[in-house]
């Protein structure tokens, strides 16, 4: 009986995971398109780099939520799900990871493909 319950549980989990992966996606865009996206005042701009990297220069209006911090998941949960999110990091790896987490939390996400290294716009320090 335990074996049957275990198999049913495992099958349910696999189907659930596959469905969520197939339907929850985010847009990865270049710097030009990212600039257009963040022109919308409703967009929440999230920088996933460390606080030190953030202080060296960030896109105006960005909020720092370090993906490697213990508070990352809690801070993402506090974001307004009725507003889109634009996320970036230094080169694109961390923001892709963050974007995957964010869409699984129910957020609409646009990610800057090559990070702030590709950004041609204004930077705040």
Where are these predicted regions, by residue range?
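Rhodanese-like catalytic fold shared by cysteine-dependent sulfurtransferases
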Residues: 2-4, 12, 17-32, 37, ...
């Amino acid at each position: 009986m335990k074996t049957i319950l275990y198999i049913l549980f495992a099958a349910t989990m696999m189907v659930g995971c596959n469905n969520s992966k197939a339907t929850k996606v985010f847009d990865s865009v270049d710097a030009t398109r990212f600039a257009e996206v963040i022109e919308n005042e409703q967009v929440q701009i999230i920088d996933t780099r460390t606080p030190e990297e953030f202080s060296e220069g960030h896109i105006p209006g960005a909020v720092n939520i370090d993906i490697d911090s213990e508070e990352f998941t809690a801070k993402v949960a506090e974001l307004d799900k009725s507003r889109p999110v634009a996320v970036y990091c230094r080169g694109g790896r961390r923001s892709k990871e963050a974007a995957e987490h964010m869409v699984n939390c129910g957020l609409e996400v646009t990610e800057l493909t090559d990070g702030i290294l590709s950004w041609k716009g204004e930077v705040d320090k």
